[in-house]
Amino acid sequence: MAMAWLMGLGLALASVLWVELVRDCYHALAHVWSPLYRLHGWHHRVFRSDLSVVSTEIYQKAHWYNDVPEALVMLAFGIWPPLLTWMWQGFSQWPLILAASAGMVYTLGFLLSAIARGVGLPNADEITDLTHRPGPFLTPPAPWMVNRTYHWRHHFDDPNAYFCGTLTLVDKMLGTALSLKGKKIAVTGASGGFGQALLQELHQQGAKAIAITSCGQEVTVIGAEKTIPIRTEQWCIGQEDQLKDLLAEIDVLVINHGVNVHQRRDGQAIQEAYEVNTFSALRLMELFLATVKTNRHIATKEIWVNTSEAEVNPAFSPLYELSKRALGDVVTLKRLDSPCVIRKLILGPFKSKLNPVGIMSAAWVARQVVKGVKRDSRNIIVTINPITFIAFPVKEFFVSLYFRCFTKKS
């Protein structure tokens, strides 16, 4: 009996997931196939940037031209789970067939709510159109479930990304869960191996890359036919306030700078390791988070922090490990109340000035980081060590839980 219940529950959840995948694929297809976009385009005409409605007439038409056809497509494809269950088990297992029909029942809810909004039923939009409600955003874009902040970006950040309606799985698979096109992204430690490689990759993705470096040289990237100089800002540890104007201007801050004192353990080495690897990064984070003020900022501003694989594994440089672990824990703490997305880059040994004997190439690591970002991974692990893929998520979960239980918001 228990097995039958579990099988029924599994079929019901699978059928709901199936129609959600159908909806998101239909949406993505509408942005590349003009006959569908002629219908879907009405949806993009409805809202102002604060999600207020331009016109009640256009709002109602958009549901007849976009939402109702979308729900009908979901309903048509939703017949497959119960049909396949019938072919597999026969009609004698009708409870399983009913369970596999959950996706159709789920879709009927969307169809009826779309019709209600299309005919202008009072309060139908407030009850059923949750991702389009106006008002201030209370949370950053969610990683797995589509919230208002996440969906706002489809309308006003990049309409060729953020296609998902309820679950973000299709965007993660397509690499459209975060658009880098046109984003101003500043990278500290830009003169290092990974910093230069990441700037190159971001430039190729259509981002406006900005180098923040303590070196006096202008940073360049390789274009289609020539070397292109990019905007380079000079900065020294302890002078983070000088970057205030830049931090207010950019969309993404990548905290990538660091120092490795190797086997040293004297007082000066301790101070240098923590000042560069931990405290300067924290000051930059605080300055950047203070610039997150509007709905657009909450939706599009981000911090990426290179905390290193040293968070959970030995790096054979104790002070490097200690300072990076401290940074990692501070980032975990800041995430609890952050007004914008904060990502961790957990990178294994790659060739750089800090690690001349690294195994991976900085260019390859940068490509994997960008792929992870576009899949909206909040913890991007790039390493050759399989232990990290297990140890880091476990550590991050329990440390975050501990901080949540024993700290409180100011």
UniProtKB/Swiss-Prot annotation:
One of its GO terms (cellular component) is membrane. Disulfide bonds: none annotated. One of its GO terms (biological process) is glycerol metabolic process. Its main location: membrane. PANTHER family: REDUCTASE, PUTATIVE (AFU_ORTHOLOGUE AFUA_3G10540)-RELATED. Involved in the biosynthesis of galactolipids found in the photosynthetic membranes. Catalyzes the isomerization of monoglucosyldiacylglycerol (GlcDG) to yield monogalactosyldiacylglycerol (MGDG). This is Monoglucosyldiacylglycerol epimerase. The lineage of its organism: Bacteria, Bacillati, Cyanobacteriota, Cyanophyceae, Synechococcales.
